[in-house]
A protein has these predicted regions:
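Extracytosolic ligand-binding ectodomains
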Residues: 6-299
Length: 299
């Protein structure tokens, strides 16, 4: 708490960044008082539902992502009953509520509704519950290390139904940790180094050359987020945190004029972003893009 109250006395700072839902939900009141724009990679829907004018996302809100996944489960997987595994934190509970709402709105029933703990190591009981439910597919919404452990346990117990998730499930880190147990996992992702767009490919090549590894979605979010700060600051014409936050409202930015954005992006009045996204599947240890999905508010 003492760390966050220090924002009140900071001067000359225009933006800050906090990565996950739990930390942004704690810090956002302090940065609001200090009138500092706060960028977050957190996906919890509650982040931008509180009317904080200084909060902006670098990833989709769960409210945007979950209907896209539910459409895929209904139209492509054609599942009638879906089991849900989620992590019991701000991130997981928000995702769980919205995927259930989105599935039920499409006539899909929920089978087992299974909570897991942050940092959980043993997923044997979770998988047993999913197998006993006998649903048509499993929706997994946990953090990266837990996702890898879940995938390994699913393979160990011979689970053969489709395993579907959002962003984390097919991320590079999960693939590395889960090994061949990640094969077949499907996810909607907002960003991936495997995207076919030329600017993303160029970023991927440069990142690998510099760091001898591939960037995951978090690296892309941070990179694009900072170029968003650059583009909007240039629009404002000066370093001014209040003017910057105001200029972020309903802004549309082009990757043609700011290549570091990699993709065209727009923000609404709440700080939620909109851009293209992807359906991915892990094939032979690699994330493969199967479909490019247009922005929700495509003009």
């Amino acid at each position: 708490r003492r760390r966050h109250t220090r924002f009140r006395n900071v001067t000359g700072v225009q933006t800050c960044a906090l990565p996950i839902s739990g930390s942004i939900l704690v810090s956002m009141a302090s940065t609001k008082r200090a009138e500092i724009a706060n960028f977050t990679g957190g996906e919890a829907a509650a982040i931008t539902q509180q009317g904080n004018p200084y909060v902006f996302r670098t990833s989709f809100t769960q409210s945007t992502a979950m209907p896209k996944i539910a459409n895929y489960i209904k139209d492509t997987v054609k599942a009638k009953v879906v089991d849900v595994v989620y992590v019991n934190n701000d991130f997981g509970k928000g995702g769980r509520d919205l995927i259930i709402k989105s599935l039920e709105a499409r006539g899909i029933k929920i089978g087992a509704d299974i909570s897991s703990d942050p940092g959980q190591v043993d997923f044997s009981s979770v998988v047993i519950k999913a197998k006993q439910s006998n649903g048509d597919a499993l929706f997994a919404y946990t953090n990266e290390e837990e996702s890898a452990r879940l995938l390994r346990e699913l393979k160990k117990q011979g689970y053969s139904k489709p395993v579907i998730g959002e962003t984390v499930l097919t991320s590079q880190k999960v693939i590395e940790l889960a090994g061949d147990a990640a094969n077949g996992a499907i996810a909607h992702v907002g960003l991936t180094a495997d995207a076919p767009q030329p600017l993303v490919k160029k970023f991927d090549e440069a990142f690998q050359k510099e760091f001898k590894t591939r960037s995951d979605h978090n690296g892309l979010k941070g990179y694009i987020g900072m170029y968003t700060v650059k583009a909007v600051t240039e629009k404002v014409g000066k370093f001014d945190s209040k003017a910057f936050a105001a200029a972020m409202k309903n802004v549309s930015l082009s990757a043609k004029t700011t290549p570091g954005l990699l993709l065209d992006v727009s923000y609404d009045a709440n700080g939620d972003l909109d851009r293209e996204s992807y359906l991915t599947k892990v094939v032979n240890g690699k994330q493969v893009v199967s479909e490019i999905l247009p922005p929700v508010n495509k003009k």
